[in-house]
Design a protein with these regions (language model features):
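N-terminal pre-core extensions flanking Radical SAM catalytic domains
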Residues: 1-45, 59-62, 277
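Short loop/turn microsegments at loop-to-beta-strand junctions
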Residues: 23, 246-248
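Short cysteine clusters
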Residues: 31, 35-38, 242, 256, ...
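Iron-sulfur (Fe-S) cluster-binding segments and ferredoxin-like electron-carrier domains
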Residues: 40-49, 265-269
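Radical SAM/AdoMet-radical enzyme domain recognition
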Residues: 54-71, 77-191
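Radical SAM enzyme [4Fe-4S]-AdoMet core and its adjacent flexible, acidic
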Residues: 132-245, 254-259, 263-272
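Flexible mid-to-C-terminal extensions adjoining Fe-S/redox cofactors in radical SAM and related proteins
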Residues: 258, 263-301
């Protein structure tokens, strides 16, 4: 289905129409953690997209041939209706970006019953580093408990890391990947740390050499380890890639703003505008100009 969504997207482009084949939706801004470099103002007044509006967004996207959605936060499992959103849309698939703290055995079993979501659980380093990176205590223990609940329930589960100076040595190595494989994790995703948000911490950003090494490690791991490694920053030929510049993805914030991606929090349109999403994506000069300028000036994130 995902491949068909991309094929329909490419066909639309040839006809002068635009609608991204993949939508990432931050359904709530609240979170129990306070991570360094988080692009969401999690301490702000809670904002969320309700079930009715989510069903509307997903329904409009399905009409365009979309079948895959990313759910983000804040912490998505703080949205009390997240399971209702999943159950109301069993004909599409969701990837849920989560810290895992609210995935109890019961929640994991319900996700398994629904069968249309994969949890992508974030691990940010050792116990000490996790506490520092995420602004709370016992973070790693709670995350690993959620991870084990997912695996015990038989869920297709991934682990992601925002790779930065304090976890680069601990997690970008064979030992960590081997541990994930031993646990039963099916896929990994290394994000490159971007210093943004209320607590940007630019000192945590990787050097160009370290970024290159992360890419090299991902490629080499794909060839020798029984685990899928995702890389959102390069295409199949190894060229730097910005998914928003290609138009493959765009993002909807908890406030309903339609943005290039979660990190670029600039918008002129909203899901609450009295226009169908098809019209918004086709007529947005801001998004069109962003894609054009980003593609011309740099392919990378």
């Amino acid at each position: 289905k995902g491949i068909r969504s991309v094929q329909k997207h490419k066909k639309r482009l040839k006809q002068g129409d635009f609608f991204p084949p993949f939508l990432y939706i931050s359904i709530i801004n609240s979170c129990n953690l306070r991570c360094q470099g988080c692009w969401v103002d999690v301490a702000a007044k809670q904002e969320k997209i309700d079930v009715e509006k989510m069903n509307d967004i997903i329904g409009q996207a399905k009409e365009m041939g979309n079948s895959f959605f990313g759910l983000l936060g804040g912490e998505p499992f703080l949205h009390k209706e997240i399971l209702q959103i999943l159950e109301g849309n069993l004909d599409v698939y969701f990837q849920i970006f989560t810290n895992g703290h609210f995935i109890t055995p019961e929640v994991a079993k319900e996700l398994k019953r629904l069968g249309n979501a994969t949890p992508l659980i974030s691990v940010e380093g050792t116990e000490i580093v996790s506490n520092e990176r995420r602004g709370k205590l016992q973070v790693l223990n709670d995350t690993m408990e959620g991870l084990h609940n997912c695996l015990d329930a038989g869920l297709l589960t991934g682990v992601c890391t925002s790779v930065c100076q304090t976890n680069y040595e601990d997690l970008v190595n064979d030992a960590w990947i081997d541990r994930l494989i031993e646990l039963g994790v099916m896929y990994g995703w290394f994000h490159i740390y971007r210093p943004v948000g209320p607590d940007a911490c630019p000192e945590l950003a990787l050097t160009p050499e370290q970024q290159y090494n992360v890419r090299k490690f991902v490629v080499e791991t794909r060839a020798k380890k029984p685990i899928v490694m995702i890389d959102a920053y390069h295409d199949g030929d190894g060229n730097a890639l910005c998914p928003a510049a290609t138009g493959f993805t765009h993002h909807i914030s908890p406030w309903g703003d339609i943005e290039p991606c979660p990190i670029i929090q600039l918008s002129k349109e909203s899901i609450y505008d009295e226009r169908p999403l098809k019209e918004v994506f086709n007529e947005s000069e801001f998004l069109s100009d962003f894609r054009k300028i980003a593609a011309e000036s740099t392919r990378g994130c």
